[in-house]
Every structure is written in C-alpha cells, then in structure tokens.
Amino acid sequence: MDTRLAREQLNLLAQEGGRLGYNTVQSVREYVEAASIINVALVDLGEGATQTIAKLSNIFGMEQMYGVRDSMLKIGSTVNHLSQNCTAAKPFIVEFAQRMAGIGSTAKMTIPEIMAFAATLDAHGQKVEMSATALQRTIMELFKKPAEMAQKVGLETNTFIETLNKSTTQGVMMFLEALGRLGEDKALAVLSPLFQDLGL
C-alpha cells in the first residue's frame, strides 16, 4: 500500500473501518486506502471526516455501486472540486451533507447535488445547521403540499409536480427560481411560516 501515513496510523484507520462495520479484509483494506488518501489530500476536514464520508457513501448507495474505496474517493473529489471553485469551506460541505443525509437519500438526491447546495449556502455566509434545516423543511413542504407551494410562487402546478417527482433537485431549483422572481417581500411571506423559529 502506497501511503505517507505511519503504520500506527494505518492500524487506527483499520480499527475505524471495523467500527463502521467493514468485516472483510478487502473492505477494511479499501477503507484504509481511501481514508489515508483523504486524510492527506483534505487535511483541513478535521478528525472524523473519513468516517462521515464512509457513512455517506453507504447511506446514498454509492458504496454498493463503486465499492468502499472508490465511493469514498468520489465524495472526497466532489468536496475538493467544490471548495476549489468557490469560497465554500470543506468542513461545511461535509457537515451539511451529513445533516442532509436522511431526507436527501429519501428524496433520491445525490451527494454531489447536496454538496452543491452546501457550497452555495456557505459561499453566501450561511450557518451550516440553519442552512441544512431550512433546506430540509423546504423539501418536506414541497412534497407535502406541492400544488399549494407551486401556486404561492406562480408556477404551473402540474409542471412543477412532474419536475419535482422526476428530480428533487430540479424541483427545488424551479421553486427557488420562481421564489426569487417574486421579490424579497413576497418571498419572505412564502417562507416565513417554515422558518420563523430559525431566525431567518
């Protein structure tokens, strides 16, 4: 294994892999390889980030598609790409994705889609916990009352529902774009019932 980490650190990573449920030599090896690369390439993610990335790859089904190593590296590459192309911080992107994992996977969003939202929100100076909660509530409300929410922002109901059912991300973007066209006062009137306890 080509790595810059000392053997003791590799052993610790192997133990981490075991705690995450990797119980074969191959899966532990792949976790150690990916984690060692991520820890060097994305050092500013901080402690525990590789475990979070591994959990995300499992929750979103990437591990089943690409294997332990490649799924983790794909997520790490997404984080690196976004942070290099805007002012978003890597820890914000990963924490946001972690907070969005439950509803994001249920709504069939991809990790790159969620991380793109994270990068945009962080670049605009939003706090991670508040941002994730706001997006979660928006998504839940759109699925709970799609016709009502479409009408509030002037969207054609059937078109919006069809778009939302096809792609959560496309539906959310359609809603947000329509919201932006309303102007600040009307947009706040639409969103305030969802976010009043968040101080937004």
PLM regions: where:
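Acidic/histidine metal-binding catalytic segments
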Residues: S131, V190-P193
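Extracytoplasmic, non-cytosolic globular domains
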Residues: A118-D122
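A short, structural motif
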Residues: M1-V94, I103-P112, H124-A132, F143-K152, ...
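Short, intrinsically disordered, charge-balanced linker/junction segments flanking boundaries
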Residues: L194-L200
